[in-house]
């Protein structure tokens, strides 16, 4: 929450405002109200790949010391700044990363030619390079594979921001848990 480099529009939260982070985690008793889905966790790949992806490191906390029957994963995306105001986090409404994904998807929807495929691939690879250490750009040769990669990236990039349901519905995909 400290960096505002990619924020286009946000709802700033100040001391005295409600804390969005409190909806996900409570300090008292370490109650995890919302644990990340295994489907989302699996999208980040192996434990080595997870460690290289800044989103996993900042969105999801793993604690192997939690008792049996308790989720070892917790959402930490909205824990807020490090100055003692836990859970007080600005709400990012539009970010550069989302714009890259929108443009990549739009390029493929407008045209199915090599230029659109190249432009969409570049947007996706640029976003991933900004998020993943040691990222190696991927080459996409067909629209369907690239669109699926964009949808998967939206799932990770926009986790806990309220986009997933609408992404599934606008694509007529099943809403499954």
Please report, for each region that a protein language model flagged, where it lies by residue.
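Acidic/polar-rich alpha-helix caps and helix-coil junctions
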Residues: 1-25, 46-177
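Short, cationic low-complexity segments
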Residues: 31-45, 50
């Amino acid at each position: 929450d400290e960096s505002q480099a990619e924020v286009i529009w946000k709802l700033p939260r100040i001391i005295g405002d409600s804390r969005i982070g409190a909806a996900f985690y409570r300090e008292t008793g370490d109650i995890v109200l919302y644990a990340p889905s295994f489907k989302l966790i699996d999208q980040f790949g192996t434990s080595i790949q997870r460690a290289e992806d800044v989103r996993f490191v900042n969105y999801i906390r793993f604690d192997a010391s939690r008792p049996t029957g308790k989720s070892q994963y917790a959402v930490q995306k909205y824990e807020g700044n490090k100055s003692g105001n836990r859970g007080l986090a600005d709400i990012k409404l539009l970010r550069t990363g989302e714009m890259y994904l929108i443009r990549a998807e739009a390029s493929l929807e407008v045209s199915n030619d090599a230029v659109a495929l190249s432009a969409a691939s570049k947007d996706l690879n640029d976003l991933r390079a900004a998020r993943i250490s040691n990222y190696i750009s991927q080459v996409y040769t067909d629209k369907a594979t690239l669109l699926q990669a964009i949808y998967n990236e939206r799932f990770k990039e926009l986790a806990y921001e309220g986009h997933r349901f609408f992404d599934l519905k606008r694509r007529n995909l099943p809403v499954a848990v």
